[in-house]
């Protein structure tokens, strides 16, 4: 990459890091904060579902807007939405208003994330795209690692301080983007997918796209990962008697593994094997991880298996983004919006079903994730066989 590409990519990485990190700051204090206003697990679950639901509803629209009005505007508006969400969260003690803040935050994330990945597609060649997507995904993973750590530290001084700091940091990201982020030169407002009206119609339109199967894989991966994450703490506590410190170490370790994989592994694997083979390989590894999680009898073994699962998903995410981007052609905003929409569907359904199944049997969420991943692996293998010529063409593009 030349200097101008690296500069723009750095700005995008900083934005993604701040956006994800500012949300991650509130994670350690969420249970105690909800308890302080007389709320518990139901409210926590609804906050996740509302955030993901708003993201789902807005994502197709946001993708179209990114194509029509430009990536820069959507990135800035998305950051404004996240900032407003955090300020509403900080100043409110009403659970209803907190739900509203999560809806605003979800809408902001829907504007921000597809626009960032569409921007990456604009400033990179086909050959560079895997590296660009993996760097932005690494910034996301780094935010997930560092945000909660900062939140836990700030909460030692005041329970609501992480909320205020999160809002201020998000606001700084808005100013940062206004001053430093330029519109991507390849953005073409005329190169858009046709306007199909409602979100459901846009989802229907995606069925006909060449990147539909990667979108479905994105949904399944998000479903499995969020289902896994949502019961992870409960499972290691119930099954192995893990302490909060043990759980924190596990979560931090998975984030570190994700960052390392996305910076140092994804691009090399994609170049040597091609996105299609990497996709199948790590779908298989993720499924194997879910299978082993059903069989392990020790905390150490489960810890190691969890690292393997997160390693697989951290590689799958940028690989899928790259494959969708290459297959999308001039519909980058629409494609990334649909990518975010399918991811949001998984983020809503995963924790919801996992929680219900966990109350029946603590192993059922892992069994369900295994079934979904096996079916997806088989589907991906068959799809790639049928579309071998198209996939080979986009993998060889530069």
What are these regions (language model features)?
Residues 28-41, 231-246:
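Short amphipathic helix-loop junctions that connect adjacent transmembrane helices
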Residues 59-70, 261-274, 358:
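Helix-to-loop junctions at the C-terminal end of transmembrane segments
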Residues 52-60, 144-145, 255-263, 347-348:
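Residue-level signature of mid-helix packing/kink "hotspots" within the transmembrane helices
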């Amino acid at each position: 990459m030349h200097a101008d590409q690296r500069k723009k990519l750095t700005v995008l990485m900083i934005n993604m890091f701040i956006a994800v990190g500012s949300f991650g700051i509130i994670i350690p204090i969420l249970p105690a904060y909800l308890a302080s206003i007389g709320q518990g697990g139901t409210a926590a679950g609804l906050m996740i579902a509302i955030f993901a639901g708003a993201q789902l509803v807005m994502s197709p629209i946001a993708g179209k807007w990114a194509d029509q009005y430009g990536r820069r505007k959507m990135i800035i508006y998305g950051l404004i939405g996240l900032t407003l969400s955090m300020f509403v969260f900080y100043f409110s003690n009403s659970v209803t208003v907190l739900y509203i803040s999560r809806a605003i935050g979800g809408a902001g994330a829907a504007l921000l994330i597809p626009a960032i990945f569409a921007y990456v597609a604009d400033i990179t060649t086909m050959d560079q795209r895997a590296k660009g997507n993996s760097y932005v995904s690494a910034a996301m993973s780094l935010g997930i690692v560092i945000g909660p750590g900062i939140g836990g530290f700030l909460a030692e001084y005041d329970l609501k301080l992480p909320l205020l700091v999160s809002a201020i940091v998000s606001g700084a990201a808005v100013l940062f983007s206004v001053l430093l982020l330029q519109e991507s030169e390849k953005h073409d407002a005329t190169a858009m997918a046709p306007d199909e009206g409602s979100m459901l119609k846009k989802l229907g339109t995606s069925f006909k796209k060449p990147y539909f199967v990667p979108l479905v894989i994105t949904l399944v991966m998000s479903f499995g990962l969020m289902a896994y994450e949502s019961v992870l703490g409960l499972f290691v506590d119930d099954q192995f008697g893990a302490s909060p410190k043990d759980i924190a170490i596990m979560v931090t370790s998975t984030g570190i593994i994700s960052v390392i994989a996305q910076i140092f592994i994804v691009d090399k694997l994609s170049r040597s094997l091609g996105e299609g083979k990497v996709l199948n390989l790590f779908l298989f590894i993720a499924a194997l991880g879910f299978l082993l999680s059903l069989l392990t009898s020790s905390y150490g073994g489960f810890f190691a298996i969890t690292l393997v699962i997160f390693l697989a998903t951290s590689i799958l995410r940028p690989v899928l983004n790259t494959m969708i981007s290459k297959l999308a052609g001039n519909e980058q905003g629409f494609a990334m919006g649909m990518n975010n929409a399918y991811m949001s569907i998984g983020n809503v359904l995963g924790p919801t079903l996992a929680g219900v199944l966990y109350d029946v049997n603590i192993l059922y969420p892992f069994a369900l994730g295994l079934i979904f991943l096996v079916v997806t692996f088989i589907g991906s293998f068959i799809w790639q066989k049928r579309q071998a010529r198209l996939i080979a063409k986009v993998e060889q593009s530069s």
